Amino acid sequence: RMNKTSKLHMTTDEFRKQGYKVIDWLADYYEKIEEFPVLSQVKPGEIRAKLPEYAPENGRSYNDILNDMDLMMPGMTHWQSPNFHAFFPCASSGPAILADMIATGTGIVGMLWETSPSCTEVETHVLDWLVDMMGMPNKFKSSSKGGGVIQDTASSSTLISLIGAREYASNGEFNSINDSTKLTAYVSSQSHSSIEKAIKVAGLGKDSMRFIDVDEKFAMIPSKLKERITQDIADGFTPAFVCATVGTTNTTAMDPIDEIGKICKEYNIWLHVDAAMAGAAALCPEFRYLQDGLDYANSYTFNPHKWMLTNFDCSVLFVDDRKKITSAMSVVPEYLKNK
């Protein structure tokens, strides 16, 4: 372990010394970030060619390692530059960076309450705060049947929601009978590609996916959704999952959650709301109308790492009934049991 006399690890004195240098390096980086070209200035393989072919037999001083960052700089795309407008927003901040150091430095594995009560309870409580801050229905709070959890990305949040929907639609029999041929999922033609991947990973198969037409603003057309659902039911399929998007990646289109939600309620279909891109806008009361209809949602995800100055990766998933997820996902051996 790290201590004042360690011969196998960095000593605590050396850790302090090098830590100051890292903070200085980062502070200097942010002070001059606008001077760098936003996009990387290298060709494929150019950075790797500067690295040793084999791992060194002996370690190097931390000073040398930090100096190597100067070699890496031409190969960096500067996501934190104010001139960066590609892909999606992903802004960090000083408090987030320092908090990440504490989280990494304490080395806690907060996979359940027993492994770190503080980690679990703070996570749960802060996500309850988010429900209030964003004006979301109270059913997403841990004090109700629902609750929230931090995930790495909205892709994994969607996968978890889809598995919950799969088991809900099949009355928990999907894993037993392994028959995906009758379950169907519905998304707009503008939905994120991760949903199609989730459908494949969850075992439904790509043929179960229904792409619903969009209007001139690239939002899902509810009447087209209902038409396809009724046709599938007539053909012997079981509609299991509908995904509405708040801010598509291509065009930031907003699907009409309220109208879609009413259809899902009528046919008892799981409604997942993917607000990864624009959900954080609900922190401002004047934009909450974009999420009207969340009362109908069974699950909801958005990414604080996009607009909330939080380090990547931080996605949050809220569900209206956590037992629908735990019953679908839980495997609890002795070493993972809480008191």
Locate the predicted segments by residue:
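Conserved beta-loop-alpha segment that forms the PLP phosphate-binding cup at the N-terminus of a helix
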Residues: 123, 127, 143-177, 194-198
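PLP-dependent aminotransferase-class I/II
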Residues: 175-241, 251-254, 259, 289
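N-terminal entrance/gating region of PLP-dependent enzymes' catalytic architecture
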Residues: 2-145
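Short acidic, glycine/serine/threonine-rich loops at helix termini
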Residues: 160-163, 196-200, 252-256, 281-287, ...
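Active-site C-terminal subdomain of aminotransferase-like
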Residues: 293-339
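Catalytic PLP-binding core of fold-type I/II PLP enzymes
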Residues: 253-285
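Acidic/histidine-rich catalytic neighborhood
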Residues: 220, 227, 266, 277-278, ...
